[in-house]
Regions:
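C-terminal transmembrane helix and the adjacent membrane-cytosol boundary/short C-terminal tail
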Residues: 156, 234-268
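Transmembrane alpha-helices
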Residues: 137, 141, 174-207, 233-234, ...
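Short cytoplasmic-facing helical segments at TM-TM junctions of multi-pass membrane proteins
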Residues: 147-192
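Periplasmic/extracellular loop-to-transmembrane helix junction in inner-membrane transport proteins
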Residues: 32-82
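Generic hydrophobic transmembrane alpha-helix motif, especially the helices
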Residues: 110-146, 153-154
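N-terminal signal-anchor/first transmembrane alpha helix
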Residues: 1-29
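Alpha-helical membrane-protein architecture signal
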Residues: 45, 63, 67, 71, ...
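Transmembrane-helix boundary motif in ABC transporter permease subunits
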Residues: 79-109
Length: 268
């Protein structure tokens, strides 16, 4: 245990000093150059604090701008991602279990995956009009494919011996799916969900740039139009930090996946 803790501390410290060095260099260079479009990090942080985190203590220091910028974005992000997870895992399981179903549907999946989601924003605008439905639909269409394909691959790689053993002991249908198939496919499902959350973050921002009045994407457009580079960079930094934290959380879960997979195999 001590070795793991020491290794984690060393790994974190190794990354931390590099991040500090890069921020310091950014501060020094931008201060010396004085380019308006590239403000120093100190100005970006101060602007972000003033915009979003200078509210009253009873609201956790969040301002009205924070609620308008973060609330719709996080709602769109997690609504789209949750719908993607449910639909993607269900479709992936069906494709993995049924070769006949996969023969007809898998080509459609690969065709849909090849379409760049931004090219369909105008279509979604026509179908759903401007608003949350259009933004969530853009996210779902753009990020469902890695979930479907990873789930399908995970289901297809389940050890046949375990399935045969389950058949002998009368474990069939949904019970077999819950006890054997899903636990064995869990590492690849989690990997697909981790990839999809990063894509969902990108499409969240992109969809909000098209006529939306609220959300971090709308904030970026407004800041650029009003020539407020520090506010624009504050939004970019927020998106980057959010993406890093989400990826780190899924990486942690993914690292525990093989251990759980091993336990699931041992239990069968």
């Amino acid at each position: 245990v001590r070795g793991r803790v020491a290794g984690a501390v060393t790994w974190t410290a190794g990354r931390l000093w590099l991040a500090v060095l890069l921020v310091w260099l950014w501060e020094r260079v931008t201060t010396q150059v004085g380019e308006a479009y590239f403000p120093p990090p100190s100005e970006i942080v101060a602007t972000g604090r003033e915009l979003w985190f200078s509210g009253p203590a009873d609201r956790f220091f969040l301002t009205e701008e924070a609620v308008e910028d973060f609330g719709p974005s996080l709602l769109n992000l997690f609504a789209g991602w949750l719908l993607t997870g449910l639909a993607g895992v269900a479709l992936g399981v069906a494709l993995g279990l049924s070769r006949t179903f996969a023969r007809y549907v898998e080509p459609i999946v690969h065709f849909g995956r090849a379409i760049p989601p931004p090219t369909l924003i105008s279509v979604f605008l026509s179908v759903f009009a401007l608003g949350t439905s259009m933004q969530v639909a853009t996210i779902v269409f753009g990020v469902i494919w890695p979930v479907v394909l990873n789930t399908m691959d995970g289901v297809r790689t389940v050890d046949g011996l375990h399935l045969d053993s389950a058949e002998v002991f009368g474990v069939r249908g949904l019970r077999r799916l819950r006890m054997i198939v899903l636990p064995a496919a869990a590492p690849k499902i989690i990997a697909g969900l981790r990839i999809s959350i990063g894509l969902a973050l990108i499409l969240m921002v992109l969809s909000e740039m098209f006529g939306s009045k609220h959300g971090i994407g709308a904030h970026l457009v407004d800041s650029q139009r009003d020539f407020e580079p520090a506010a624009m960079w504050a939004g970019i930094v927020f998106v980057g930090v959010l993406g890093y934290l989400l990826n780190a959380a899924f990486t942690l879960v993914e690292r525990r996946g093989p251990h759980r997979h091993h336990l699931a195999r041992a239990a069968t």
